[in-house]
Amino acid sequence: MSLIDAGRALLSLPQALLYPPPQTTSAPLVTVRNGTYSGVYNSQYDQDYFLGVPFAQPPVRFSIAQGLNTTWDGIRTAHEYPVHCYGYGWDQDGFEQSEDCLYLNIVRPAGLHNHGLPVAAWIHGGGLWMGGAADPRYNLSFIVEQSVALGKPVIGVSLNYRLSAFGFLMGKEAIKEGVANLGFRDQRLALSWINENIAAFGGDPNKVTIFGESSGAESVAAQVFAFNGRDDGLFRGAIGESGFGAPLGRYPGGFNATERPQGTYDSFVRSVPSCKKLAGSDSTLDCLRRVPSEEIDLALRSSGGQSWAPVLDGDFFADYTTNQLASGRFLKIPILIGANTDEGTSFGFRRVDDDDDLRAGIKVMMIPYGVEKTTGKIRDGLVDELLERYPNNQSIGIPSLETWPHVIQPGDGYAEEFGLQYRRDNAIFGDYVMQYQRRRANKAWAKHGVPSYVYRFNIRPNGQPPEAGVGHFQEVAFVFHNTNGDGYEPNPFGGNGTYPADAKAMSKTISTAWINFINDLDPNGDSGPELFNGNKWPTYELSGGPNGKGVVFNINGTHIEVDDWRAGGMEWMAEHALTVFGN
């Protein structure tokens, strides 16, 4: 099984593994602005669930979603998880999909209805092209239960948003009509609904923290940078796991890279039979809105449902992230952000044996044609600069030799499967996709005097092969305190020896830190030194040098480290973020 296949197996989602079956004794009722909902009481967790609550009118395709504008008498049920929005990837397996998908779920502790509780709003990941709030791995019951046990109860919310082309249409026509970045706008509308209605569930609208992983963390960053950092009072804190940084730049080539997004749109139009004759004209959107959803879905499956991305539209994103960070045009709220030690094993190429292989991959993914216009440098020279900062030395690549002691040699099985420069390749692409943007954000927050915290997750879950290291997504079960392993196969907390007990203890530590931040905007809470092996989790400060300090989560505890690993490579990426990567 390849690393990619192993990762997909870990992420498998049989629908039978959805949240613990609710045991209804009496249905909780809540009256919001539009009417009254009946939820479900779960006696096992002593929690109330309100599931599949709409936060918008059924969306008009390729249009900005509108808030609810009708009221009703009587009681509507909120007993079932919503469908997924249309998406393209394994996270869709086993789930019904629909364009009518803008719903959210609320999990609250029972009996605390008028306490003004802090709220944690989860934004799922999946590349902005797959996933949904009904995913059992995002079961909010466990972290809500943990919050009650700590004496710091919170309300959990999870939300859907449109994906792929439905949510992230690109091209000149979409920008002209103001319908780019619709998925992020959906999230914004959900946060507005929470702001207006969460008090009815016992939540405090002034104590909302948004959190997400991967493209969910990218979404969290998008909300922080949205509208030039405008503060709409929708949330006061943000947590980004493996993805916080720059929502723009998926099509590198510098700040004038527009050909590939337009080409993606044109190819999509040509793949829709009812609209292909209009490709290249200015009237394609009207046609795309009229055809059946099944025709759009089939076209995306054939033309690339995973090819869509956020774009600079002059409205939701008024400027590039690089410029906003430099000028302080972002929402100045406390953030807790980080990533996993070996992110690159999920994003690097395979079978990279020599410099030529690596150069080819870098040119495809990072430094394409056109950068000469924005950098004034020769493309090959830029590749040389990058490779100089990432030497072919397995002792400094990922996964580390501590995590996986095997040194890849010519002729061994790992060389055949992964390539001789596997570790070097992983380090470059992991830093590019996940790490440098996060570090750049921590530094910007520090320069502008805003509290931020950084972590590095360094625990390899049960079922993750050693050669994959501590890869992408592996912290999610620990954050949610999902020690039952709901939605996972195998259970990340299974295994032999002391690992299960140690992993569960670390999950308690991590989820406690997140709960502390949601309550206090500080992960330390009242017992920081006790929580972090005698240390306090420090805010990210630059007074002692060019890099701050953060917490590392290990299987046997935590320690504090200076955030300066692979500094040369990530500094180069940050310096070229706008001119090469277009963010």
Model-derived segments and spans:
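Gly/Ala-rich beta-loop-alpha elbow adjacent to hydrolase catalytic centers
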Residues: 212, 216
